[in-house]
């Protein structure tokens, strides 16, 4: 999922910035070119959003999924709440090419954040230590400790409040 989503985000960002440069230099594209651009951007956007449901499902226990999906819905709409007014205000004040460039920069920021916080190596099971749990805690009984740590599919929950790190 990461490879598809990051690749599509990178392509969409570059395509958007290229489209902005074209519009600043040459103006709005013709109707046929506009439809082709719209279709390409839609395919790239769908390549980012379509795997998101699977990613969210893998990131939470079944009982937490409604909250995770609600949080993703709220966050995506908060981002749109920023992007739509920026597009409208910048587009009316400085032109559509400049608006497209601003949105391309916003997409680039999102891509850089994703690259920084989503590790390229993201194994399903992660070995980790629970210093705060008693040796007879049910979680440690479900996933026995071996070599001073235990492994299982890792999600943020009551027993795992932070993502394990290597240092």
Q: Model segments located where?
A:
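C-terminal transmembrane bundle of multi-pass solute transporters/carriers
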Residues: 1-121, 125
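Intrinsic disorder in cytosolic terminal tails and internal cytosolic loops
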Residues: 117-167
């Amino acid at each position: 999922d990461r490879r598809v989503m990051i690749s599509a985000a990178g392509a969409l960002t570059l395509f958007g910035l290229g489209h902005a440069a074209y519009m600043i230099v040459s103006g709005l594209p013709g109707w046929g070119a506009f439809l082709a651009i719209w279709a390409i951007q839609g395919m790239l956007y769908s390549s980012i959003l379509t795997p998101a449901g699977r990613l969210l499902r893998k990131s939470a226990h079944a009982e937490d999924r409604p909250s995770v999906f609600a949080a993703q819905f709220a966050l995506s709409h908060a981002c749109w709440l920023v992007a739509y007014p920026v597009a409208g205000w910048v587009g009316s004040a400085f032109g559509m090419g400049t608006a497209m460039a601003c949105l391309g920069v916003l997409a680039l920021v999102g891509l850089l954040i994703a690259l920084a916080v989503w590790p390229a190596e993201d194994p399903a099971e992660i070995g980790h230590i629970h210093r705060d749990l008693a040796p007879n805690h049910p979680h440690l009984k479900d996933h026995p400790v071996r070599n001073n740590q235990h492994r299982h599919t890792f999600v943020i929950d009551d027993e795992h409040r932070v993502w394990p790190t290597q240092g």
